[in-house]
Amino acid sequence: MKYWLAAFRKQGLTGLQNKSTRPKSHPRETPIRIKERIIELRKKKRRCALKLKWDLEDEGIKVHHRTIGKILKTEGLTRCYRTRKIHWKYVRIPLAKGEIVEIDVKYVPQELQGRQYYQFTAIDCASRWRYLKIFDDYGNSSSMEFLKELINIAPFRIRAIKTDNGSNFTNRYTGYLKSSDPFNPRLHPLDLLCQTLGIIHYLIDPGKPQQNCFVERSHREDQEKFYEQTQFKSFEELRYKLRLWNMEYNDTRHCGLNGLTPNQALRF
């Protein structure tokens, strides 16, 4: 009763109305210094809450990834839409290093001195380790040169590669027209090279880039975190900065590897 009288004397009838009992503070609230660091890392690296959690652990800061997600949502640093994920019931068979390596080509968005360049990408499905190189064309010779360099530089033996149905990778749709014997179509130079090296060459189904999911996802990472944030004025500068970016990628923790980096996954 004394609180009602005090409120009535102070605010009149307005003081007797019901008010929110929500607490004005919380004993376990995240410190403002940690919140500012989370926001800073999000704007700088544009990573998800789980990867930000690992980055903070490297700095000696322990915060649950759900707490980080709530902070990002409160600050408006998350996307405004949700994607519905379809969960299929299947048995995931772990792959060995080099068992399947996905290879694809990405157009460099920015022309240099009026010329178009192309990024060849190879990524190991088991460890997510990858290798990049820039070419001034994406023909058969570039594909073969890239595969030869990949074999020499990869820290594992490549048993099979997987590509799309581009003319720089296969003759699946053009070999019959170029061959005098339709029942024995001419093989693509890359297929002949794979036979010489003892490498199996898999092809994805037409119109199914999802079957090359690892390399397609890495290309999205390149677009969002390298090409959209990096400026280069010459071919040499592009190659240098791309090499640094790929080194950072191979030393970045991945959710698909349970927090390991591709270089760490190679040791297991």
Regions found by a protein language model. Give the residues of each.
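Basic, flexible linker segments flanking DNA-binding modules
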Residues: 13-36, 40-101, 167-168, 174-188, ...
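Mobile genetic element proteins and their domesticated derivatives, centered on retroelements
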Residues: 1-4, 12, 37-38, 52, ...
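A short acidic/small-residue loop/turn micro-motif
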Residues: 136-140, 177
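C-terminal domain-tail junction helix/linker
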Residues: 197-199, 220-268
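Mobile-element integrase/transposase regions
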Residues: 62, 66, 73, 77-123, ...
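DNA major-groove recognition helices of helix-turn-helix
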Residues: 8
